């Protein structure tokens, strides 16, 4: 029996069958995820096809279950960034003029300078409580350390966000008040 479009049958090491979905857009092969059944994988493929063939210019905030029934939100962001800006980035980044947004979820958005694009396009950001980190060579690296904020620093005492937005990590928005490095 022939697979549905965009769907490939695969097998786990323990013998369980699962279905991978992918699409090719602008000569780029894009994985859409793994699914338990062929219909869900095909639905994700159909969602992605509808997005890239649509005349609409979608933005990340336009995500809804009526547009994407099976496609993950993070994959939505990657696809519309590729469609609108011409650059495919596997992490959920949407490029803006002189900065970019990194989407941890639809309502959890981080802002960075374009200078950090290369780093965050290759590192997935994770959140545990208020702790934001990337996995780097088996370690959890706090993203605040990239901006001179020490792990023991206290907000509004040792550093502050100039515009008050704790999710805005643009260099101009971070002011180090106490650059204490330890006793020398």
Predicted regions and their residues:
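Positively charged, aromatic-enriched nucleic acid-contacting surfaces
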Residues: 17-25, 30, 184
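An aromatic-rich alpha-helical recognition segment common to small helix-rich domains
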Residues: 21, 41-49, 184
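A short, exposed loop/beta-hairpin motif centered on an aromatic-Gly-Thr core
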Residues: 28-39
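Short acidic/polar inter-strand loop motif in beta-rich domains
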Residues: 53-56
């Amino acid at each position: 029996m022939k697979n549905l479009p965009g769907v490939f049958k695969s097998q786990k090491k323990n013998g369980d069958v699962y279905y991978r979905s992918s699409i090719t857009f602008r000569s780029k092969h894009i994985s859409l995820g793994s699914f338990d059944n062929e219909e869900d994988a095909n639905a994700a493929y159909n969602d992605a096809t509808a997005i890239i063939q649509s005349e609409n210019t979608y933005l990340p905030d336009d995500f809804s279950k009526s547009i994407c029934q099976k496609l993950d939100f993070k994959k939505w962001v990657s696809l519309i960034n590729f469609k609108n800006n011409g650059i495919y980035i596997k992490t959920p980044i949407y490029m803006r003029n002189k900065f970019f947004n990194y989407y941890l979820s639809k309502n959890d958005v981080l802002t960075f300078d374009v200078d950090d694009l290369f780093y965050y396009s290759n590192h997935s950001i994770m959140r545990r409580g208020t702790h934001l980190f990337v996995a780097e060579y088996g370690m959890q690296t706090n993203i605040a350390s990239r901006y001179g904020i020490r792990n023991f620093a206290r907000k509004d005492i040792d550093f502050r966000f100039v515009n008050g937005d704790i999710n805005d990590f643009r260099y101009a928005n971070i002011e180090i008040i106490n650059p204490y490095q330890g006793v020398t």
